[in-house]
Amino acid sequence: IRDAARTSIGSVMPAKSLELKHTIKLIQELTSEINEIEDAIRKIMDELKPPILSIPGMGFYSAAMILAEVGDFSNFNSPDKVLAYAGCSPSTYQSGKLTNCYAHMEKRGSRYLRYALYTATKYVCYWNPVFTEYLTKKQAEGKHYNVALSHATKKLVRLIYALQKSGKAYLAIT
């Protein structure tokens, strides 16, 4: 009876129970595919040994997303170009000799990179005292949390750029 109860579904309609069995099987297949892909990402990251993983609070998958989206950092002349690629640079308006800078982010770049940087910044600000202090300083200046976090994101991009260009691990300044 117990075996029958484990394999059966509490539904009178056979179509619903068949649909549920197929849905469960599909979820199990997708879960195994996700695990396989995550293992492949982990192997690639173990081979690369990127210096950005030495930043306290930098997550494994955030680092993988950032590296996958940016690719080769030598394609960018400066961290500002990486910020612009992510869509985190301030929007500008130009007409003739007038150049005006607005306070809003452009959000024209890679939304995946922007998401990975934003998520990584939250954790780095929590685990890294240098970034925690920077975030607190920006909030003390009267900036909204999200604005302060965008400033911390810019600081993180500058750090990631420097680490990837130099190939050296992060050393905290105490």
What annotation goes with each model-predicted range?
Residues 1-174:
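A detector of single, family-specific signature residues
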